[in-house]
Amino acid sequence: MSRLQTRFAELKEQNRAALVTFVTAGDPDYDTSLAILKGLPKAGADVIELGMPFTDPMADGPAIQLANIRALGAKQNLTKTLQMVREFREGNSDTPLVLMGYFNPIHKFGVERFIAEAKEAGVDGLIVVDMPPEHNSELCDPAQAAGIDFIRLTTPTTDDARLPKVLNGSSGFVYYVSVAGVTGAGAATLEHVEEAVARLRRHTDLPISIGFGIRTPEQAASIARLADGVVVGSALIDHIANATTPDQAIDGVLSLCSALSEGVRKARVS
C-alpha cells in the first residue's frame, strides 16, 4: 500500500477524517517554508499538499497567487521544491506528501526526470490542475507506473457523464472542489457537500477530500463529518502573508493547523 492508502486506511479505522494542509513551497522563503513543512505533521496535518510555484496559477485565488509571487521572488523553483521534500523526508517517513501545481514547470524540467526525482525524493502523489484525463499518457500514466498517485480534481460542474472519465486513472484520493471557481472562495453549503460526496461515492471507492473555502476549526469539523479528508490552504497561507517575521509565519501556520486538527479529530465524537 502507498503512504496515502495507508494513512487513509488508518484514519478510517479510527473513524476520523484526514486534515490535508496546503502550503506553497518557498513561501515566504526556503528556510521558513521548510520549517513550516517540517512542523505540520506534529501540528496535526495528516496529509501535506506542497504547491509548486508557477508564474500563472490560474485556478488559484488571490492568497495562493500571492504565495506563488513571494516564493518565486525568493528564487524558489522545482529543483529546490524537490530538495525541500528530501529534507522533509530526512525526519519524516510516514506523512504522505503530494505536490500540487501546473504542468508547465514539470514539462520544462522534463517529465521523465521529474518523475524519477520526485519518486526518489519521497513524493507520494501529484495534483496537476491543468492536465485533464485526455492527456493521461503525458504524466498520469508514467507517474503511476513509478508508484506516484495521481489525484484528480472534481467540481460541482463535473456531471455524471464526465465523472467516470475524470476518475479514470485517479488514485490516492479524489479532491472535490466544493465551490466552482478559484481557491479560497466562499464556503459551500453543507447540504451541497453532502450531496456531492454521495454522488462521488457512487462512482469511486477512493477517499474523498473536500477543499476550497474552509477557514475555521468549526468549518473543518462540519466537513470532516461528511468526507474522508478536509483540505485547508488559503487560511494557512494568510498567516504567512500577514507575518512580519519568519517565526511569526511559522507559529501562525502551525497554531491554526493545531486548531483545525482538533476540530477534525473531535468532529465524529458523539
Curated annotation (Swiss-Prot):
Keyword presence, Translocase: no
GO cellular component term, pick one: cytosol
Annotated metabolic or biological route of this protein: Amino-acid biosynthesis; L-tryptophan biosynthesis; L-tryptophan from chorismate: step 5/5
First-tier enzyme category under EC: lyase
Entry-linked Pfam families: Trp_syntA (PF00290)
Domain of life of the source: Bacteria
Active site: 49, 60
Signal peptide span: none
Keyword Lyase set for record: yes
GO MF annotation: an example: tryptophan synthase activity
Catalytic activity: (1S,2R)-1-C-(indol-3-yl)glycerol 3-phosphate + L-serine = D-glyceraldehyde 3-phosphate + L-tryptophan + H2O
EC number: 4.2.1.20
HAMAP family: Trp_synth_alpha (MF_00131)
Subunit structure: Tetramer of two alpha and two beta chains.
Primary role: The alpha subunit is responsible for the aldol cleavage of indoleglycerol phosphate to indole and glyceraldehyde 3-phosphate.
Protein name per Swiss-Prot or TrEMBL: Tryptophan synthase alpha chain
Gene that specifies this protein: trpA
